[in-house]
Regions:
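Membrane-interface junctions at transmembrane-helix termini in multi-pass inner-membrane proteins
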Residues: 135-157
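Interfacial segments at transmembrane-helix termini and the short loops linking adjacent helices
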Residues: 46, 114-130, 317-333
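Residue-level signature of transmembrane alpha-helical cores of multipass secondary-active transporters
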Residues: 18-26, 60, 95, 99, ...
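Helix-loop junctions and terminal segments of transmembrane helices
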Residues: 37-38, 67-83, 261, 266-303, ...
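Interhelical loop/hinge segments that connect adjacent transmembrane helices in multipass membrane
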Residues: 2-11, 15, 179-186, 195-239, ...
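Signature of the first transmembrane helix
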Residues: 13-71, 107, 166, 226-252
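Hydrophobic alpha-helical transmembrane segments
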Residues: 54, 124, 128-131, 155-203, ...
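Interfacial transmembrane-helix starts/ends
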Residues: 15-16, 53, 85-101, 222, ...
Length: 333
């Protein structure tokens, strides 16, 4: 009984600690853009910002195809076998093989598009810089850390990469000619995180590839991965199609103007949704215990809080949109 109580206390402490780390990471995703975007938007101005935005958006879509739905699937399946290193290693080897295959195919298609689609040829240099992230997708292995709930490592890694990005920006980015350098810094930060992940993952698996002749059961993963991927693809297309269409139909100037407003909107949405991880455990607890009355009461409280916070934000944005845009992005916007 004593062991059980200790185990439950440790589990509660772990959940609370993970929740704090998750909130910290959410805060970083808000704070860092509030530092980098106002700085770079004033240096690269509207056209430069639009050029960066279009290339980054195109690359994100290809990166999604390279990664498939492996993160979500890997976390789910990895959590089931994480206490058996042999089984976890087999799962990792199978998912790495799928990820490598999808990455190679995606990268080939990406290169063909860059060199043969007229609009993308205009962004060739920028796309090739951002395209490096596609090649390192298979090395990310984020799902391994998600399966083992290594949120401390994930948070520390994120802090290191983002601090590097901010310092490199301040030291190296000073005028319009640094546009490609800024893209390279952004890419290096992402690639660096993937390289960290790859080498650090060795402690969780025996090897990245079977040391003996062993037939990997790759086919069994394809269907569930593609189902999850379809959901992610629909979401990604919905959120990124606007920038892509603007890029093909208009110029960098209009992309830059649109991206500035979207960037501010996304920062506010991140602030708004940062509360979700705090509410979810309570909601799940009520549902598991079949306490539906308590669930409905708690849900109504959440709804009132969301409306109470969201309505003033929306009203403030409508009334002060020009001033907010000028403060964050600069007068050219």
């Amino acid at each position: 009984m004593l062991r059980l109580n200790i185990g439950l206390k440790m589990k509660k402490k772990s959940v609370a600690f993970n929740a704090i780390l998750n909130m910290l990471r959410m805060m970083l995703t808000v704070i860092v853009p509030l530092i980098t975007f106002p700085y770079t938007s004033r240096i690269f101005l509207v056209e430069g910002n639009g050029h960066l935005s279009f290339a980054a958006t195109i690359t994100q879509i290809f990166t999604l195809f390279a990664s498939l739905g492996i993160y979500t699937y890997g976390v789910r399946e990895g959590a089931k076998v994480r206490y058996d290193k042999s089984k976890f290693t087999t799962l990792a080897q199978e998912l790495i093989a799928i990820n490598m295959l999808s990455t190679v195919i995606t990268y080939i298609v990406f290169i063909i598009c860059v060199f043969y689609i007229p609009k993308m040829k205009e962004y060739k240099c920028m796309l090739l810089i951002y395209g490096v992230t596609i090649g390192f997708t298979a090395l990310g292995l984020d799902w391994i850390y998600g399966a083992y709930e290594e949120y401390t490592y994930i948070t520390i890694r994120q802090i290191i990469c983002q601090v590097f990005t901010i310092l490199a920006m301040i030291i190296l980015i000073h005028d319009k000619s640094d546009l490609y350098l800024w893209a390279a810094i952004s890419v290096f930060s992402s690639v660096g995180a993937n390289i960290f992940n790859f080498f650090n993952a060795k402690k969780y698996i025996y090897s990245y590839w079977p040391l003996r002749r062993k037939k990997l059961q790759i086919v069994r993963h394809i269907k569930p991965i593609l189902i999850l991927f379809a959901t992610q693809l629909a979401t990604k297309i919905y959120s990124n199609l606007d920038i892509v269409l603007l890029g093909f139909w208009t110029s960098d100037y209009y992309i830059g103007l649109y991206n500035a407003s979207i960037k501010i909107n996304s920062i506010l949405i991140t602030c708004f949704t940062a509360m979700n991880p705090v509410f979810i455990p309570k909601i799940v607890g009520y549902i598991k215990k079949n306490q539906y009355t308590d669930f409905l009461d708690f849900f109504s409280k959440i709804l009132r809080i969301m409306i109470g916070i969201g309505l003033p934000i929306v009203t403030g944005l409508e009334m002060l949109s020009s001033n907010i845009l000028c403060i964050i992005a600069g007068k050219p916007y």
